[in-house]
């Protein structure tokens, strides 16, 4: 069961009577609860941008105790000098017999001043272990397995073909439902993700607000040792407390985790000729200080019909002002016949040329242009700042050192 609607002002209570009816902070909360506000923006942001929620919890967060440096640091140093070459990786993870939870399975791939990208692998649930990211919100893009995200606001169910966003500062734990789970993770430290403007598309299309789902209140009332791991200023810290931090019995507000089924994306595409720009596939965006230039765009290339006439249908050859990090959830990407599979990653930074490989080009340039259905799901994290690659990703054996060879078959066919 979920609450529906992107950015709506929601309210939910796991126990009847836990929510105050006429105010936020009563002198004495019902059921012996404590009122606590969680702010996602400054108090004075314009009303349409203002994000906050009121939580009614068994214990206030201030009881969590002292934080100490954690033994594992998820953030990794970047390569000192990065060439303008295109880069691609095969999937980093194979199945492991070693127990590995969500935090232990994070692998830092690349970052920019306000965005970082990781992959995650987990085959073990976080039972009495919790995570919070004070540095930004987290966008989950799974490609294998099913996980349940137990958050301060309630539970989200997540599997391949769906996404979830955990806001900055919200504590959660990951329960692994399948044998193992794998996915991509994007950390956004800029403006919170929101729906893109639709412009001439009109009032409807792309991701519809009513399809975004928010959790109903659920809580843990358990004692014993509970470990909280917190990412704060690019470092991991931990504390041990004697009560679960997921102790919110009721909440109301517009700052909360949410999930979305990508199959509900209303894809816009040409029904005449040419290939529209990929901005028409934007699901969520984080706006920068420059109008029309995003800090982060989350873009998908979903299952869709291709019907353009007298047109080269795959993505065109391109040198981009923006910086692209791509992944594949399932299927075969229409611009890459080989080498780019689910779990893989490619990075094409500003002005780095990219486009269909030679085999894909040859097929698309000569095929009979009948309506064609593409059953795949690729995505892109696009940012205005260069993707800096971590040393561990740059030197990882899954990096395809021969990636540029996929474009070496092209010949000069010009004739006057």
From Swiss-Prot:
Family from the record: Belongs to the homogentisate dioxygenase family.
Q: How does it assemble?
A: Hexamer; dimer of trimers.
Give the gene that encodes this protein. hmgA
Q: What does it do?
A: Involved in the catabolism of homogentisate (2,5-dihydroxyphenylacetate or 2,5-OH-PhAc), a central intermediate in the degradation of phenylalanine and tyrosine. Catalyzes the oxidative ring cleavage of the aromatic ring of homogentisate to yield maleylacetoacetate.
Q: Name one GO biological process term.
A: L-phenylalanine catabolic process
| UniProt keyword Metal-binding, yes or no | yes
* CDD domains reported in the protein's UniProt record: cupin_HGO_N
| EC number of the protein | 1.13.11.5
User: Catalytic activity, per the record?
Assistant: homogentisate + O2 = 4-maleylacetoacetate + H(+)
Q: Which Pfam families match?
A: HgmA_C (PF04209), HgmA_N (PF20510)
Query: Which HAMAP family does the entry mention?
Result: Homogentis_dioxygen (MF_00334)
Can you say what this protein is called?
Answer: Homogentisate 1,2-dioxygenase
Q: Identify a single GO molecular function assigned to this protein.
A: iron ion binding
| Organism annotation | Legionella pneumophila (strain Paris)
Q: Which GO terms describe its cellular component?
A: cytoplasm
Cofactors needed by this protein, per the record, are: Fe cation
